[in-house]
Every structure is written in C-alpha cells, then in structure tokens.
Amino acid sequence: MTEITDRYFNDVIARLSGLRDRLAAQMEKAADLIAAAARADRRVYVFGTGHSHMMAEELHYRAGGLAITVPILCGSIMLQDGAVASSHFERIEGAVRPILDRYGIRDGDVLVVVSNSGVNAAPIEAARYAREKGAAIIALTSVAYSNTIARGRTQLLSLADVVLDNDAPSGDAVLEIAGSALKVGPVSTALGVTILNAVFADVAARLVGEGDAPIYLSANMPGSGDINRSLVERYRDRNPHL
C-alpha cells in the first residue's frame, strides 16, 4: 500500500471499531423495529438521495438480505440521470411526496432514511411522511456533520425513532493531502453499509430462530432459484422493484 491508501484503511477500520461499541444499543433498537415489522408482515423501506440512495440498492434483492426490504428509487433523486439536477432536487420542499406516494407506506412499516448531512428537504420530508403514515423511522446520518451545518434548520435526527450515527466527519472526506487544502477519501458509504448490514443480520438471526426468515440466496448458489422465486412471489405486491 501507499501511505495514503494505508491511512484510508486505518481511518475506516478505526471508525468501524468505535461504532461497534458506541452504536450497539441503537443498532439493537433498530433491529427491534425491523423485526417487529417482519413479524407483522410489514415492510422496511429504505430512502436516500444522491450517494445515499446506494444504501437502498445495497439492501434490495441482496444475497443474504431480507425480502421485506423495499428500496425507494427514482431517477430524479439519484445520480445517473443528472448529478447536478439531483442535488438541486433534494433541496426542493414537497418534491419527494409524489415519489413516496407510489410505495404504499403504512402503519407498522419502517422507513430507513439515509442522509449524511441530515438537513436537506428530501430526507426531512420523507421522515415526516413516514410519521404521517404511522411508520417507524430509523435515521442513518452523521450527527457531527448535521450539527455543524444545521443553522436552525430541522435535522433528520430530531424526527427519528432511532438514530444511527455513522461517525462521518463534516464534509465526509477524511484524508488531507500535503500541499493542498483539499481532502479526499469519503467514508460515509463504507460506514453506512456496514452499519445497516449488521442491523439486518441481527434481524435475520432473530427470524431464523423463530422459523421464518425471508432471506435471499445468491443466484449462483444451489437451490437459490426456487427459494428466491418463492420470496419474490410472496413480497412483490408491495415492492415495485422486484
């Protein structure tokens, strides 16, 4: 490794080690909410804009993932249809309600809202929408970053039932480069994916113990075709992305 790649690995590993202990109670609370939704045949929706939408894709139709998970995906809040436009769109009040209306979020569901800054209009609106519908809210955000830039604005962390603080610094990037004021090496994705997969693994373990764990297999594993087809048929009525 070069010096800077070594620093990046060390930073991410140190943050993950700290999160494992510091977030233990909050992760257990998040798993409680998701497991309760699974037992009641409810759904767990995952919403994020910009790069945060990758969390929704990560948990959707995933080998080793839960079939109760529904990603909220729309080109206008993602990056592939125009990154600059998407960054503008996520700041417009009222813009995401029509997107959320397509999914049928209801009482007993869970909405995971992912936003590193936790202050843009889209994640705030998503959390308020979930509250209106009677769904529980899990926020994955950077508390430090959000507190730094809030300046009186509503913060996602104030609207959630459970807050998962990803420990990303303000601005996300962690590596200074000699001779430059710029930083590189964003960490929020690596930290966020690890946190959410750990929570969902906890939920899966509980459901296995209770005899009903709707877990997808990798498409290349023996027997995966029948298992995955059965899960798709069971859950596709409330997941438009299957």
From Swiss-Prot:
Entry GO MF terms: carbohydrate derivative binding
Secretion signal, residue range per the UniProt entry: none
Gene3D superfamilies xref list: Glucose-6-phosphate isomerase like protein, domain 1
Chain coiled-coil ranges: none
Gene Ontology biological process terms, A to Z: carbohydrate derivative metabolic process
PROSITE patterns (UniProt xref): SIS
Positions of the SIS domain: 30-214
InterPro entries: RpiR-like_SIS (IPR035472), SIS_dom (IPR001347), SIS_dom_sf (IPR046348), SIS_GmhA/DiaA_subfam (IPR050099), UPF0309 (IPR022951)
Record Pfam families: SIS_2
SUPFAM superfamilies attached to this UniProt entry: SIS domain
Family from the record: Belongs to the UPF0309 family.
Listed name of the protein: UPF0309 protein BCAN_B0929
